[in-house]
Design a protein with these regions (language model features):
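Active-site-adjacent structural elements in enzyme catalytic cores
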Residues: 1-249, 253
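Positively charged, low-complexity/disordered segments
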Residues: 252-254, 258-264
Length: 264
């Protein structure tokens, strides 16, 4: 217990001094920084080599702290009571007097927020005076990190500290909902959309506006393997391996499609 508290204090010290810290979540590891600090948030973009027009998800301890920065609506309250903390992100209206860094939202009047379930991160958030912006801890468009060694492989000594919380249980990012108007799905993720619809008692609209980037994970290039990929291969060459995608969704509406690049 003492070592856990010591690690949390160490992570807090780095965050308080506007450094980036890798943190565990139930979905994937995040690269965290003080969401109220422009200089800290800019370090996230620099380390990840991430475009500045790609908004970040901000992690809060609870809905009471969220009220300082966002307008709370009925749909959020319903979903929060059922699924948060957990692998779901909400896009909400940002208050005019919010202290959230403009780099988090790309100067938009909306923000993507979530309440992580991992006990270690929740303990850290409870002890901070600010929420943290925390996109996945990987170079932009590369595969997400699900354990400390993945983070170390991606960034080496470029980040100050990795808060070791073991392997992420879910392994894929959070489901993202737009709650600015009628609830709509922006990204499939760690929470089944059917469960969300059961709580809302309505079908989710599917986001079709690819130009309006309200949250992270909405760019055409998101997951890119670091080695060449060949498709429709009958026999692998030496040092190659098969990569198989299994479709287990109960409904075709849960499929996202994209044209493969010519280099694949």
């Amino acid at each position: 217990m003492k070592s856990i508290q010591s690690n949390i204090k160490k992570a807090k010290k780095y965050l308080d001094n506007n450094h980036c810290v890798a943190v565990p979540t139930e979905t994937v590891y995040g690269l965290a920084a003080n969401a109220y600090s422009n200089s800290a948030v800019k370090k996230i973009f620099s380390l990840k080599k991430r475009p500045l027009n790609n908004p970040l998800i901000v992690h809060y301890y609870d809905i009471q702290r969220l009220k300082e920065d966002c307008d709370i609506n009925d749909n959020l309250v319903k979903l929060y009571k059922k699924f948060s903390p957990g692998p779901i992100t909400y896009v909400l209206k940002l208050k005019n007097n919010s202290k959230i860094s403009k780099f988090v939202t790309n100067n938009k009047k909306s923000i993507a927020v979530r309440f992580p379930k991992h006990k270690l991160l929740r303990n850290l958030l409870k002890n901070l005076d600010y929420p943290v912006a925390a996109p996945s801890a990987n170079i932009s468009s590369r595969l997400s990190s699900v354990k400390p060694s993945d983070v170390k492989e991606e960034f080496g000594s470029k980040i100050k500290y990795i808060l070791n919380g073991g392997k992420s249980k879910i392994g894929v990012e959070s489901t993202i909902l737009n709650l600015l108007e009628k609830p709509s799905l922006l990204r499939y993720g760690g929470l089944d959309t059917k469960k969300i619809e059961n709580v809302l008692k309505k079908k989710l609209l599917i986001n079709t506006n690819s130009k309006k980037k309200l949250s992270s994970g909405l760019f055409p290039l998101h997951y890119s393997p670091g080695i060449p990929l060949r498709v429709n291969v009958k026999k692998p060459k030496k040092d190659e391996a098969y990569f198989c995608l299994l479709y287990t969704s109960p409904s075709p509406r849960d499929l996202s499609t994209s044209r493969m690049p010519s280099s694949a």
